[in-house]
Structures are given as structure tokens and as C-alpha cells.
Amino acid sequence: LILAPGLDPHDYEPRPKDVAGLADASLIFAVGLGLDPWAQGLARSAGAGEARVFELGPLMDPILAPPGLIRPEPLIDPHFWTDPVRAQRTVDVLVEALSGLDPEGGPFYRERGGALKRSIQSLDAEVSRQSETWARRRVVTLHGSLFYFAARYGLQVTAVVQPAPGAEPTAQHMAAVVTELRGPPGAALFTEPQMESQVATALAREAGVPLHEVDALGGGPKAASYEELVRGIARAMDGALR
């Protein structure tokens, strides 16, 4: 694991021990789609070679967010794992890649991959039932991280606060987001634990709406597993949209 739990991949800067830890790696899995552009350089620094970096995102039917209120230019959301259907596809890709690298371990990877997919299928059915109360509700996020979850479970992401991760929105964009939050019916505003939320806090105050938190990255004590991550997102939606 290169990126420690709780860190924002957009701001990550490789440390010497991260480089050293990859020196003997046979395969490096990355998200791609602009989330971890440092992965290729990190592999080169470690002597692992670019060919050993396997980007998963481009294989997951990336979602292109629309222009307009969302941000001035289209953006691609790299957080494909928030959709359990794509997560199951990711398991298949991982099993195939690992089996190709280690053919003798193939039966083990396929067995474990099958068990994980069954768990994710059950999770998807659980959240699908839970999401019936959210149908067509509107959400505003700090940055573009919930388009896949929203598409899977019938939500509408109608605005993104930051035009790009870490970028300050313009006054015009802030005003448009405030208008969106005020409705009618008003959209729910979400920040994220890995990112600074001062702008989102100011927006919530200006619009007179609550500020909710959702974790699309996971890794912390409340989202240590994939299932906990998705259930955590679902709980956040329940708390904001019921």
C-alpha cells in the first residue's frame, strides 16, 4: 500500500521509503484517470519501470461529468469503486493480472476473487434497497467523487464546489452553488474528511444548509474495508436525504 489511509491522493508526495518499498515490486496497481499521476514517476524512481504500473480506471467505463454548473470544463471522476458493479469488474481484472504474474497461484486468486464478488453483490443489493428513499435527490460535493455512486443508486450530483481538487472556486461559481443549495428543493452539501472544508463550510453558512461528510476514499477506522466504505457512503446519504 503506497498511500497511507486518510491521505488525499491529489496532494500526495512520494517519500524515500515509498520509493524503496517498490524496488522489488513485480506489479503496481494504480487508479489512473488523473487521481494518482505520481504513480508512473514513483515506479521509475524505484526502478520498477512504467510497464509494471497497471492503471485500473481506464478499464472501468469512466464517467465524464457534464460542464456548466459542475465546473467550467468537463471532468472525469476517477472514483469508480464507489459503484459496486464496477468494483466487481475490478476484482476480475485484478484476478486476471495476478494470475498472469503467478500462474500457480491462479486457483487461489480465482477462489478469493469469487468470494469477494459475492460479498460485493450482496452489498449492492443491500444499498439498492436502502437507496429507494433517495431516488432523484440532489447532492453537491466538495469535488467530483460521487458520480459513480450517484449513477448506480439514482442520485443527481448537480454541483461540485471545487472546479479541480484543491482549486479555489470563483465568486461566480460560489454564487451558483449557493443558488443550487437553496433549491427548491434544496440539495444536500457534502465535504470529505481527507480535504480542507473551509470553502464548503462557508457555502453551508451562506446557503443556510447543513454540511454533511462523506468518505469516498476510505482507509480510516470507519471505512477499513470496501464494504464499510460503501455502507459509510450510504449512511451519509441516509442522514442527509431522508
Stretches found by the model and what they are:
Residues 1-242:
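Extracytoplasmic metal-acquisition and chelation regions
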